[in-house]
């Protein structure tokens, strides 16, 4: 991953403003668009210690995740009082297993993730700088089974007004990254500089967007 020390340091210092304490309401609202059923497998890239993993595990028999930070993965299981089975996969990866959950530690690009029916990306693509996003998406495509679907949550703002992460990934870039896939914009939540949080960040506009991305069967 690009600049892994940045993320290791964030977790070590507990500087995790990107972490939501509750299940993402956008996941709850739009997951049905992926046509889920219990037998369909799910992958959550760069999953951190997301509460979304718990929610997804109640609806699917297999939920895989990958997270660079071992601190995050251990915290996830400890905070839920889960005792996972831990398997050393290689010098780079460990696998934490508990019921429906299979969480790998280490690099997203080399973790031995199995292909899945559905992918949920809430804070992964937007965490990556522009120079690595195409490589990230290519790996995502490799892990998606034919006919599979991706629920993607992104941000769109003027990148010159804030350094990121999270980075701005506008629709034009989504169209380029997922060329050949069916792309549907499900939701667009737009705020301008009259919104106090947006003004505080020095942004003129800010949009959170939800996409359904579908591969051919």
UniProtKB/Swiss-Prot annotation:
Belongs to the class I-like SAM-binding methyltransferase superfamily. TPMT family. SUPFAM superfamilies: S-adenosyl-L-methionine-dependent methyltransferases (SSF53335). InterPro entries: SAM-dependent_MTases_sf, Thiopur_S-MeTfrase_Se/Te_detox, Thiopurine_S-MeTrfase, TPMT. It catalyses: S-adenosyl-L-methionine + a thiopurine = S-adenosyl-L-homocysteine + a thiopurine S-methylether. GO terms for cellular component: cytoplasm. Its main location: cytoplasm. CDD domains: AdoMet_MTases. Signal peptide: none annotated. PROSITE patterns: SAM_MT_TPMT. S-adenosyl-L-methionine binds at residues 11, 46, 67, 122. Gene3D superfamilies: Vaccinia Virus protein VP39. NCBIfam families: PRK13255.1, TMPT_Se_Te. The gene is tpm. This is Thiopurine S-methyltransferase. The keyword Isomerase does not apply. It is found in: Cytoplasm. It comes from Vibrio atlanticus (strain LGP32).
């Amino acid at each position: 991953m690009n600049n892994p020390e940045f993320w290791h340091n964030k977790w070590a210092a507990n500087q995790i403003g990107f972490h939501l304490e509750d299940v993402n309401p956008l996941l709850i609202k739009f997951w049905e668009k992926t046509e889920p059923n219990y037998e369909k497998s799910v992958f959550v890239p760069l999953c951190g210690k997301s509460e979304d993993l718990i929610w997804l595990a109640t609806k699917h028999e297999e939920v895989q995740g990958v997270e660079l930070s071992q601190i995050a993965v251990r915290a996830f299981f400890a905070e839920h009082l889960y005792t996972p089975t831990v398997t050393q996969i290689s010098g780079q990866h460990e696998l934490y297993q508990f019921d429906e959950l299979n969480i790998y530690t280490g690099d997203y690009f080399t973790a031995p993730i199995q292909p899945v029916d559905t992918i949920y990306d809430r804070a992964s693509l937007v965490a990556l700088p522009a120079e690595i996003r195409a490589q990230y998406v290519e790996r995502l495509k490799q892990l998606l089974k034919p006919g599979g679907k991706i629920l993607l949550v992104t941000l769109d703002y003027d990148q010159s007004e804030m350094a990121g992460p999270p980075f701005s990934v506008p629709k034009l870039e989504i169209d380029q990254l997922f060329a050949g896939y069916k792309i549907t914009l499900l939701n667009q939540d737009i705020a301008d500089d009259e919104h106090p949080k947006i003004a505080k960040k020095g942004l003129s506009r800010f949009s959170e967007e939800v996409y359904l991305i579908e591969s051919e069967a």
